[in-house]
Amino acid sequence: MANRGPAYGLSREVQQKIEKQYDADLEQILIQWITTQCRKDVGRPQPGRENFQNWLKDGTVLCELINALYPEGQAPVKKIQASTMAFKQMEQISQFLQAAERYGINTTDIFQTVDLWEGKNMACVQRTLMNLGGLAVARDDGLFSGDPNWFPKKSKENPRNFSDNQLQEGKNVIGLQMGTNRGASQAGMTGYGMPRQIL
């Protein structure tokens, strides 16, 4: 956690809630996928959130991962170098995030650089990597390595084509929101406040 002191009060409660969202089982799946997917040897961290964060913190593993999802020669991150300088590490994380967005990840699904670098929200980092893996499986371009069942299946577009005849017939059907013209009705019922007529 960089140069920040401990959180107290409400900030501490919020931080604890965020930390509870972190999934250790998902961490192992992501590590397995990243080590399988990357073309170069990126190592393997010990189990635990801090070890996972330190493994990804300099951005080199993330850049290798996004480059491995593109064909040879079309890698989005051209220069990957390990560095101990904070701004270089954060720059590489930013390059990964920009490349992930170009790959097709929604802006709302992408973590902030500080979430990873300061370890503020590692669950958000996991969600971004899960979305990236799911999108790589859905693309089905032969560049995904690993078990497709590791990631949730993305839905695919399934357009419907109706003929003009079918569209015209649909206009004749009374929608369920309108009620029905069959079954019990209020015919013969008296209004409120009127006496009941028994003959």
Swiss-Prot record:
Mark the Calponin-like repeats by their residue spans: 174-199
Which InterPro entries has this protein been placed in? Answer: Calponin-like, Calponin_repeat, CH_dom, CH_dom_sf, SM22_calponin
Q: Name one GO molecular function term.
A: actin filament binding
UniProt modified residues of type Phosphoserine: S11, S163
List of residues that carry Omega-N-methylarginine: R182, R196
| Modified sites of kind Phosphothreonine | T180
Assigned GO CC terms: actin cytoskeleton; cytosol; extracellular exosome; extracellular region; vesicle
Keywords of the record: Acetylation, Isopeptide bond, Methylation, Phosphoprotein, Ubl conjugation
Domain Calponin-homology (CH), chain residue ranges per copy:
24-136
Task: List N6-acetyllysine occurrences by residue.
Answer: K17, K20
Q: Enter cross-link residues for Glycyl lysine isopeptide (Lys-Gly) (interchain with G-Cter in SUMO2).
A: K171
Q: What is the annotated tissue distribution of the protein whose record heads this document? A: Expressed in epididymis (at protein level).
Give the similarity note: Belongs to the calponin family.
The identity of this protein, by name, is: Transgelin-2
Originating species? Homo sapiens
